[in-house]
Amino acid sequence: MKVLNELRQFYPLDELLRAAEIPRSTFYYHLKALSKPDKYADVKKRISEIYHENRGRYGYRRVTLSLHREGKQINHKAVQRLMGTLSLKAAIKVKRYRSYRGEVGQTAPNVLQRDFKATRPNEKWVTDVTEFAVNGRKLYLSPVIDLFNNEVISYSLSERPVMNMVENMLDQAFKKLNPHEHPVLHSDQGWQYRMRRYQNILKEHGIKQSMSRKGNCLDNAVVECFFGTLKSECFYLDEFSNISELKDAVTEYIEYYNSRRISLKLKGLTPIEYRNQTYMPRV
C-alpha cells in the first residue's frame, strides 16, 4: 500500500488499483492504518537491540525472556511476529557435532547414570575434551561444567591434547570447592581419564569418578550439548585466521555463556544469576 500511495503522484489511483487488483476500500483501510503511530515501535527497537547485542544468537524465545526481564509483558508469538517483520532470525549455523574421542577403555563405573539434575552447586560435575581446527592447526578445550546450573566453572585450552591440560582444568575447579564438598566428576572413557595420575588427583580431593559406557555419548549429554552450542554460537559464526584469534573468541564466549547468555532451562537467568539467586550456601 505504501508503494501504491507513492505512485499516486505519477499515475491515476484508479489505474493503480485496477493493475494491483485491490479494492478502493481496502486501499484506504491500509492507508489509514499506515498513518497511525506504531504501537510496537519501542518494543521493536528493543528487540533489534537485544538481537544485535547477542550477535544474532537469540531466537524469539530468548528475546521474549529478555524483554520479560526488563518488565515488558509480551508473549512469544508476538515477539516471533515482530522479529519476522524486522527480518531478524537466529544466525546459528547448525552442523553435526563430533566430539574429540581418542582411545577408550573403562576404568570407573557409571555413577551418574544420566541423572543430570543437581540440587546444589558442586554436587555433580561433567567434563570432556573437544577440538577445533584452524588452517591445519588444532586447539583443544577441556572444561568442567557444574550440573546445578550448567556453568563452566573451569576450563583449559591447549594446542595438544596432553594430560597437563586436564590437570590445569582440575586445579581451577578444585579452588571452587568448600571443605565439605566432594562432587562426582563424570567423563567419557578417554585416555586422560584412565590415567593413574588423573585417578589419584581425584582421590586426593575426595572426588568420586564416574565414566560413560562405551559408545554412549548420551551418558555425557550435557557437556556434549555445551560443545555443540559453543561451536554453533561462536566457532561457526566467524572465520579465524589463526589459533590465537580462536583462543580469544572461546575465552570471550565462555564468559558470555556464564554471565550474559540467558538459559531457557534456568527460567530466563544466566548460569551465574541462577546460582546466586536460587541457592543459599550452607554456613
Swiss-Prot record:
Chain ranges of the Integrase catalytic domain: 117-279
Keyword terms of this UniProt record: DNA recombination, DNA-binding, Transposable element, Transposition
Induction: A shorter open reading frame encoding a protein called DinS, encoded by a 0.4 kb mRNA encoded within the insK transcript, is repressed by LexA, induced by DNA damage.
Entry keyword Ribonucleoprotein: no
Any one GO MF annotation of this record: DNA binding
Residue ranges crossing the lipid bilayer per the database entry: none
InterPro entries: HTH-like_dom, Integrase_cat-core, RNaseH-like_sf, RNaseH_sf, Transpos_IS3, Transposase_IS3/IS150/IS904
UniProt keyword DNA-binding, yes or no: yes
Biological process according to GO: DNA damage response; DNA integration; DNA recombination; transposition
Alphabetical list of Pfam families matching this protein: HTH_21, rve, rve_2
Function: Involved in the transposition of the insertion sequence IS150.
Cross-referenced PANTHER family: TRANSPOSASE INSF FOR INSERTION SEQUENCE IS3B-RELATED, TRANSPOSASE INSO FOR INSERTION SEQUENCE ELEMENT IS911B-RELATED
Family: Belongs to the transposase IS3/IS150/IS904 family.
Official protein name in the record: Putative transposase InsK for insertion sequence element IS150
Organism name: Escherichia coli (strain K12)
Gene giving rise to this polypeptide: insK
